[in-house]
């Protein structure tokens, strides 16, 4: 009997509007009823409008067909397909060159996917470049380069975090390089540039430099400073003096002699090539060996050439930089990489700038860089979003030259679709209230982890005489449009052979809250319209954190009262006394869910313990958990939250 009922319960579906688990027939009836109500409302509205100006009657939204995302599609066609046609190399080499001055965010995940994916698809490699650069490969295709040219802002922890992020996403570096690997070579080329009379040492301050570039708004004539008239020997002497510590920070800098007077492109207005850092912090790798450091505009293009990067793929804010990139490479190096630019990924309703994130952290709005409400990669991971779900979202969006502005709702919907078929299901009660089944008998129930995928296996749960349901699933007074538990009303318990009927309840004399419900099995009644989740006695206590949008508006960075004025004071709700069934132990033991190459590290990572709490949401174990305490973060809700900004 129990097996038959369990099989029937496995076929229940979620009513998105009420959050109830119901039969397919019942859901069909509800949808039809809502459609009739919507049509009637539309007809009443239409009757009040002028003839010929009637809007179409509202119809229930059709359930979208499940899309199968081809991860290679964005490399075969569109922008990236065209990029390859421009330079169809047999051996493609790309790079991912972050500056190690902070933690990566969602936009960086797109850059990783683009560069590693492009090289992998074309059988090449990707390098990772850091302050230097690092060359990486997605499973041996890309280079990762660290652009480590600013020791004042760079820290060793950022290098480690960036490498960890790349591997978490499932990509393996073919090579890791650093801009600092090439410091001497770049210095020598800077001297060559001086000898070619294409660079000079300048002593102008910021105010004077701005005047040379046309003033604050660029409305005045541009001109080159007097230092550009210095001869080669003078410039070489000064540049070597910069190297040897003869100048104070910001008192001298090497400028490229480009075309400041005639070229309308600001990236050709005699950009800086070398500067003396203000704080003179020791470099992460080279210590105090160097007192001067190349700028991004000088180092980036040269390192691309040194490393044989065939396709230098970056975001559209570097479109104008392409001219200076090519100008410098043509002067100094033989191998010429090709730079092309694609649109950034922006998420509305949040911020990803380092300055904004620091403001939130310093004002204790969030717990740190890994707060689940942030869209840093650390925050996304702690929240429980799997690497595969993140990549699937990026592949779904594709790549164009336009900036991609995406709502939080769309992001969460993509994650929800990914999780639906890849994580097990458990029962969780946020606000438990006991139900004593007076005629109940204890028995073991075999519950599948997924009603749709038997490969996920099953677990045993003990049906006890006292069970706990969510307080929101009981009403003291019944109504016709209410289908959960109420006095004299019947409701199904997920995977339990018989529905229960509430016969009485008691209340706390002080608070007025429901203290206990008494019920009996309704063995002869009709099949219930609704099933609710429950947990037995002996279930595991848990703290559950439900996170909403961190900001009230879609553009928190532009809020009239500043960033902090736009913070949503209700962005986190904590349920301290939740209960989860003991099947959680098995889910934890078998993590990661789903299996992912980047999460098979041999170490336990709590956020890989992911599951769907039936009728509640998707959850992951938080890093605040201990052996004695379970802490859960909501990954995404089961249905779209209408109150969430889009």
Swiss-Prot record:
Pfam families: tRNA-synt_1c, tRNA-synt_1c_C, tRNA-synt_1c_C2
Skewed-composition ranges (Low complexity): 38-61
CC terms in the record's Gene Ontology section: cytosol; mitochondrion
Enzyme Commission code(s) on record: 6.1.1.18
Positions in coiled-coil regions: none
Motif 'KMSKS' region: where in chain: 351-355
PROSITE patterns on file: AA_TRNA_LIGASE_I
Residue segments, region Disordered: 25-65
Intervals of motif 'HIGH' region: 98-108
Domain of life: Eukaryota
Keywords: Aminoacyl-tRNA synthetase, ATP-binding, Ligase, Nucleotide-binding, Protein biosynthesis
GO biological process: glutaminyl-tRNA aminoacylation
GO molecular function, one term: glutamine-tRNA ligase activity
Binding-site positions, ATP: 99-101, 105-111, 315, 344-345, 352-354
Binding site for L-glutamine: 147, 296
Recorded family membership: Belongs to the class-I aminoacyl-tRNA synthetase family.
Function: Glutamine--tRNA ligase; part of the gene cluster that mediates the biosynthesis of virensols and trichoxide, fungal natural products that contain or are derived from a salicylaldehyde core. VirJ does not seem to play any role in virensols and trichoxide biosynthesis.
Record-given protein name: Glutamine--tRNA ligase protein virJ
Species assigned in the record: Hypocrea virens (strain Gv29-8 / FGSC 10586)
Gene transcribed to yield this protein: virJ
């Amino acid at each position: 009997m129990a097996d038959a009922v369990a099989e029937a319960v496995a076929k229940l579906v979620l009513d998105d509007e009420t959050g109830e688990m119901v039969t397919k027939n019942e859901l069909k009836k509800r949808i039809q009823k809502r459609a009739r109500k919507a049509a009637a409302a539309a007809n009443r509205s239409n009757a009040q409008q002028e003839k010929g100006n009637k809007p179409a009657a509202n119809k229930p939204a059709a359930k979208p067909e499940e899309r199968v995302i081809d991860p290679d599609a964005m490399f075969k066609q569109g922008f990236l397909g065209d990029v390859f046609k421009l330079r169809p190399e047999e051996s493609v080499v790309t790079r991912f060159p972050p500056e190690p001055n902070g933690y990566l965010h969602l936009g960086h995940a797109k850059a990783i996917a683009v560069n590693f994916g492009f090289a992998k698809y074309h059988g090449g490699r990707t390098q990772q470049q850091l302050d230097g650069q690092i060359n990486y490969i997605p499973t041996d295709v890309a280079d990762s380069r660290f652009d480590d040219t600013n020791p004042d802002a760079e820290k060793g922890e950022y290098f480690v975090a960036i490498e960890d992020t790349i591997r978490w996403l499932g990509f393996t570096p073919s090579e890791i390089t650093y801009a600092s690997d090439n410091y001497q070579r770049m210095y020598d080329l800077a001297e060559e540039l001086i000898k070619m009379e294409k660079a000079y040492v300048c002593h102008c301050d910021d105010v004077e430099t701005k005047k040379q570039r046309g003033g604050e708004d660029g409305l005045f004539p541009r001109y080159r400073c007097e230092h550009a008239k210095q001869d080669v020997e003078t410039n070489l002497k000064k540049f070597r003096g910069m190297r040897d510590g003869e100048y104070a920070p910001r008192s001298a800098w090497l400028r490229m002699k480009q075309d400041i007077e005639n070229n309308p492109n600001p990236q050709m207005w005699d950009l800086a090539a070398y500067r003396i850092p203000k704080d003179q912090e020791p470099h992460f790798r080279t210590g105090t060996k160097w007192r001067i450091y190349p700028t991004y505009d000088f180092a980036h293009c040269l390192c691309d050439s040194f490393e044989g990067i065939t396709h230098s793929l970056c975001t559209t804010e570097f479109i104008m930089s392409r001219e200076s990139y090519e100008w410098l490479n043509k002067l100094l190096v033989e191998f010429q990489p090709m730079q092309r630019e694609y649109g950034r990924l922006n998420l509305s309703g949040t911020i990803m700038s380092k300055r904004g994130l620091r403001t939130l952290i310093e004002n204790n709005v969030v717990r740190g860089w890994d707060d689940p409400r942030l869209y840093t990669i650390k925050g996304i991971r702690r929240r429980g979003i799997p690497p595969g779900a993140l990549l699937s979202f990026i592949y779904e969006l594709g790549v164009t030259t336009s900036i991609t502005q995406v709502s939080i709702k769309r992001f969460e919907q993509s994650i929800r679709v990914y999780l639906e078929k890849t994580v097990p299901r458990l029962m969780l009660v946020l606000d438990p209230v006991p139900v004593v089944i007076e005629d109940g008998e204890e028995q073991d129930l075999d519950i599948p982890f997924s009603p749709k995928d038997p490969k996920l296996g099953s677990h045993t749960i003990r049906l006890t005489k006292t069970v706990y349901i969510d307080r929101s699933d009981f009403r003291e007074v019944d109504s016709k449009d209410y289908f959960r538990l109420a006095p004299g009303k019947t409701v199904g318990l997920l995977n339990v052979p018989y529905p229960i009927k509430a016969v009485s309840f008691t209340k706390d004399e002080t608070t007025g809250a429901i203290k206990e419900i008494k019920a009996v099995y309704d063995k002869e009644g009709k099949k219930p319209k609704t099933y609710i989740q429950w947990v037995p006695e002996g279930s595991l206590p848990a703290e559950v954190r439900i996170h909403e949008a961190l900001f009230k508006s879609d553009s928190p960075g532009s809020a009239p009262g500043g960033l902090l004025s736009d913070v949503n004071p209700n962005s986190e709700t904590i349920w301290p006394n939740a209960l989860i069934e003991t099947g959680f132990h098995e889910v934890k033991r078998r993590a990661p869910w789903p299996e992912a190459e980047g999460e098979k590290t041999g170490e336990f990572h709590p956020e890989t313990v992911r599951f769907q709490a039936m009728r509640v949401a998707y959850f992951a174990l938080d890093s605040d958990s201990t052996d004695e305490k379970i802490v859960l973060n909501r990954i995404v809700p089961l249905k779209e939250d209408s109150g969430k900004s889009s």
